[in-house]
Amino acid sequence: MVLEVLNPRHYNITSMVTEVAPVASIAILLLTGFLLLVWNYEDTSSIPGPGYFLGIGPLISHCRFLWMGIGSTCNYYNKTYGEFVRVWICGEETLIISKSSSMFHIMKHSHYTSRFGSKLGLQCIGMHEKGIIFNNNPALWKAVRPFFTKALSGPGLVRMVTVCADSITKHLDRLEEVRNELGYVDVLTLMRRIMLDTSNKLFLGIPLDERAIVVKIQGYFDAWQALLLKPDIFFKISWLCRKYEKSVKDLKDAMEILIEEKRQRISTAEKLEDCMDFATELIFAEKRGDLTKENVDQCILEMLIAAPDTMSVSVFFMLFLIAKHPQVEEAIMKEIQTVVGERDIRIDDMQKLKVVENFIYESMRYQPVVDLVMRKALEDDVIDGYPVKKGTNIILNIGRMHRLEFFPKPNEFTLENFARNVPYRYFQPFGFGPRACAGKYIAMVMMKVTLVTLLRSFHVQTLQGRCIEKMQKKNDLSLHPDETSDLLGMIFIPRNSDKCLDH
């Protein structure tokens, strides 16, 4: 054959192509495979997780976040690949971590104080480099955090006890407003109105329409959750963004009216000490040139939405757990009778309510609302032996960690899990370190006041067969019940005023 090919007189082009083509195809495939191997070599990682495979891996992992929600996706990847996993969001390397040692390292170091999310999404909801919750500019975040810290501690914390208790009593007296036609109480709406009323009295002090603002807060939260990880192309298609932009605008417009009224009150006040609060401090900072008007407005908005957004759902879950566990309710009621009795609750009662505190902790561990934390690495680092590059996104899967380490009965709801002191590295419902939740202390006090005040007046029941474990939930930016379900109502039974323990 070789001689025929070399000899022009015997050259047969058809025969040559037929015989050489398979060899050439194999050579091309081998060369292509080698080039792909070289191209993808830099994308290999010692960290467990799905493969890169020509960019298909990052595309699939991002789509999974958009489809399943952030929380559900994190649980999927940790369950599939382990407690330290590498995936991608918007093409950026992202770590999903549920190891306590890794979380401890990240939370305590200042080079993890930035968050991450779609820049266009955060701009749409007003959080890009503004406010405190998802402000991913460390310098601007540090500028506003002292205002939150001051408002959420000290005298504000003491005053909150009375303000919150009064708000709960007022709303319980108007319980018919949140009952449906069957007499079941819409606890989520009740708690959201109480939390908004309390936050407004403490931090803004302008009369508002609770019903309307609560609905607008829910629309804003839905937009925030939907837009946080969307790719840039999503925002170029106007009809896709329209409903979210409207939800954001509805709340911002309502808040703008309230904040403008606050500005007017400050400018006409005879004594500034009569209107000094969180909003006033921010407005003064704006007048000094320390903060922009847009940043001030966003900070006030975030302060008012924080409790209705998360704490109201936490208390909702707690009441469902109390209804299912009568022995826990009995222990709580005994402590309330011993510590508080028939008088009004006070700030100095807080440290004595240990059963209530352990119940709150166990509820937040067993059925969390905020079960993940999102951060960004600002420097190169090594975490538990794994290299982490500057700019890497990090999601701390706290909810999963709370069911993996330390607790004697991690998959059960029982106060035995807090019968002994729990090292804080194993239990982080509010985080810790430089970017810990600024409101963690006031949140604990507010939940104690809410439970004590409500349970002294009512015994709570769920509809037959309904419990947290069977409840439909959505686990995205936070974990919420599916509010399209008609199974969320509760029965409030007035207690015997003479005997706190009578049901």
UniProtKB/Swiss-Prot annotation:
Sequence positions that bind heme: 437
Entry keywords, A to Z: Endoplasmic reticulum, Heme, Iron, Lipid metabolism, Membrane, Metal-binding, Microsome, Monooxygenase, Oxidoreductase, Transmembrane, Transmembrane helix
Compartments where found: Endoplasmic reticulum membrane; Microsome membrane
Membrane-traversing stretches: 19-39, 51-71, 303-323
Domain of life the protein comes from: Eukaryota
GO CC terms: endoplasmic reticulum membrane
Listed GO MF terms: aromatase activity; estrogen 2-hydroxylase activity; heme binding; iron ion binding
Entry membrane topology: Multi-pass membrane protein
Catalytic activity from the UniProt record: testosterone + 3 reduced [NADPH--hemoprotein reductase] + 3 O2 = 17beta-estradiol + formate + 3 oxidized [NADPH--hemoprotein reductase] + 4 H2O + 4 H(+); androst-4-ene-3,17-dione + 3 reduced [NADPH--hemoprotein reductase] + 3 O2 = estrone + formate + 3 oxidized [NADPH--hemoprotein reductase] + 4 H2O + 4 H(+); androst-4-ene-3,17-dione + reduced [NADPH--hemoprotein reductase] + O2 = 19-hydroxyandrost-4-ene-3,17-dione + oxidized [NADPH--hemoprotein reductase] + H2O + H(+); 19-hydroxyandrost-4-ene-3,17-dione + reduced [NADPH--hemoprotein reductase] + O2 = 19-oxo-androst-4-ene-3,17-dione + oxidized [NADPH--hemoprotein reductase] + 2 H2O + H(+)
Entries under InterPro entries matching the protein: Cyt_P450, Cyt_P450_CS, Cyt_P450_E_grp-I, Cyt_P450_sf, Cytochrome_P450_Monoox
Names of required cofactors: heme
Record EC number: 1.14.14.14
Top EC class of this enzyme: oxidoreductase
Binding site for substrate: 309, 374
Single Gene Ontology BP annotation: lipid metabolic process
Pathway: Steroid hormone biosynthesis
Function: A cytochrome P450 monooxygenase that catalyzes the conversion of C19 androgens, androst-4-ene-3,17-dione (androstenedione) and testosterone to the C18 estrogens, estrone and estradiol, respectively. Catalyzes three successive oxidations of C19 androgens: two conventional oxidations at C19 yielding 19-hydroxy and 19-oxo/19-aldehyde derivatives, followed by a third oxidative aromatization step that involves C1-beta hydrogen abstraction combined with cleavage of the C10-C19 bond to yield a phenolic A ring and formic acid.
Family: Belongs to the cytochrome P450 family.
Identification of the protein by name: Aromatase
Annotated gene: CYP19A1
